[in-house]
Amino acid sequence: KIVLDAGFTCPNRDGTVGRGGCTYCDNAAFHPSYSTAGKSLHQQLDEGIEFHMVRYRTTEHYLAYFQSFSNTYAPLERLKVLYEEALSHPKVVGLVIGTRPDCVDEQKLDYLAALADGSAMPGWSRDMADGTVRHAPVVIVEYGIESCYDSTLRRINRGHDFVTARRAVEMTAARGIDVGAHFILGLPGETRQMMLESCAMINE
């Protein structure tokens, strides 16, 4: 995955939901040096590929990882431009989109489903190392859920509840889009039993 900064912000920082962000939020702490919003997506991809080739020398294809802040927090037409720009890079075979569960809607998810089945970008293809040809990109949505407990979500100033997260995951999965979920186990106030119960809820 090549980490990208597409210049997004977050509704929990700009005043739409809250200000200051979540209590633990520090995007700069996990930014690679090549990933800065002042560079084009293609430049970030080129530099990210060069960075990773030191370790993964035989890798031919990459996923563009929209990681910084909430990467569906923009009008749909803007998202289309950004996602399709990343997918136009010849070594990119798919997208991983990190976002908040309160930053998706039916229209955005319908578009992502169309990307995933190939109908949004007809003619897009990639020759794979095993001799096959992909006619649709990989599309994965990763939600920052963090906790199953509303009391914890309030404590960390998350700005949404667990019902919102569950609904977003179900809406995404119902469209056949691959879904990932980020949790932070052991947040202040959570017990071992709560963590085990969280695992059970995640597995549902």
PLM region spans:
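Distinct, well-ordered alpha-helical segments
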Residues: 76-84, 105-116, 193
